[in-house]
Design a protein with these regions (language model features):
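Calcium-coordinating acidic loop motifs
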Residues: 42-43, 324
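Bacterial N-terminal signal peptides
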Residues: 4-15
């Protein structure tokens, strides 16, 4: 199975602008059908999984986060029970060393660091809402140990690989690295202590991974692997989530990506991994809003400027047109659960329910 199948999981959503009630009824119906389909795919014990019963930890964390975006919490709302079951499933699989997930399970897919990162993200948001004292203390302990494991798993170059640096011979990979950066940020936002030097090392790592053209390479240790637009978009979203909207590095990355993913070709993309490339790109353009691009590039022509309204109109129409009658979308090889989570994330960017998604 291709390593790129989980690239699209590597980034958080950024910054709300409008409430979901501003969506036309047609798109609200698309979201409702998609969420109803997604919860039907949840197993009785609370987990989701991808095709071939793979990536259970990552899919469970991502599915739970999508339901949180709807506005439900672990206590209240239409999907509160689904959220609680997902959280319980992950909490029951914490290892002594702090890893969230079973490193020996067949359904870990390519490696356990993806699932670990997304589990930190999901549980950090649960922790911020948990009112039960005993359960809150348990979550704090889990997240503290999970952060410590994440820091120990970092490679000497500042990135992360599919498994820890010790288990993976210090191998790094861009999409996994960004997953861990976002996980650490979510934990810090929730009040968990996160060593600053680990995040600083990753920032330097991403700089070193950037080519003269502005694209990010696949791996620093392996000497490259070519420029990857998907990882580059993920890096922009990661940079934006830290408040660095106009850094020179973010500008270089965006200038590299923009001609490769034109808004005019939404739904007609001629490159691989378009679902998760747009998963990233939607987040980036959403953060830019209507005037963010011109603030980054004051000399840009009006026809060049990326705006959320323009992108949203094109992509939401595509999602409405391609949704199946049961609420699903046809999936890439990793499966329909993953595809639905990507698309439902994009469709709910305007909700702005969770602190981690706010400017």
């Amino acid at each position: 199975m291709s390593r790129w199948l989980l690239v699209g999981l590597a980034v958080l959503i950024i910054a709300p602008a409008a409430r979901s009630e501003d969506l036309p009824p047609k798109y609200r119906a698309v979201v409702d059908r998609g969420l109803k389909w997604l919860v039907k795919q949840q197993h009785r014990d609370g987990h989701w999984e991808a095709a071939g019963s793979n990536f259970a930890s990552a899919m469970t964390a991502m599915g739970g986060t999508v339901l949180l975006m709807e506005g439900s919490t672990i206590r209240d709302g239409k999907y509160s029970e689904n959220i609680r079951k997902a959280a319980d499933w992950l909490m029951e699989r914490v290892q002594r060393n702090g890893l969230i997930g079973d490193p020996n399970a067949a359904n870990q897919g390519l490696g356990y660091m993806y699932g670990h990162g997304f589990s930190i993200l999901f549980l950090s948001q649960i922790y911020g809402e948990e009112e039960d004292g005993e359960r809150r203390r348990k979550l704090e302990d889990i997240l503290t140990r999970a952060v410590q494991f994440c820091v120990r798993a970092q490679t000497s170059r500042g990135g992360w690989g599919y498994v820890s640096a010790q288990d993976g011979n210090d191998f790094d990979e861009g999409s996994v690295s960004i997953t861990q950066v976002q996980a650490l940020r979510a934990a810090r936002n929730a009040g968990i202590v996160v060593p600053k030097q680990g995040i600083d090392k990753t920032h330097e790592y991403l700089k070193k991974c950037t080519t003269p053209r502005g694209g990010l390479i696949y791996s620093l240790q392996s000497g490259g692997g070519g420029e990857r637009p998907t990882i580059t978009v993920a890096a922009i979203a990661s940079m934006f989530s830290t408040g660095e909207y106009t850094s020179d590095l973010a500008k270089r990355w965006l200038k590299y990506v923009q001609p490769l993913v034109p808004i005019e070709s939404v739904g007609r993309d001629q490159f691989g991994h378009s679902e998760y490339t747009h998963y990233y790109y939607a987040q980036v353009i959403y953060c830019l809003g209507e005037d963010g691009y011109v603030k980054m590039f004051p000399e840009s022509k009006e026809s060049e400027r990326l705006t959320w309204s323009r992108y949203r109109n094109a992509f939401f129409e595509f999602l409405a047109r391609t949704q199946n009658a049961d609420g699903s979308w046809n999936g890439v090889p990793i499966g329909q659960v993953y595809t639905a989570c990507c698309y439902l994330t994009i469709l709910q960017l305007d909700n702005g329910v969770l602190p981690i998604y706010q400017r």
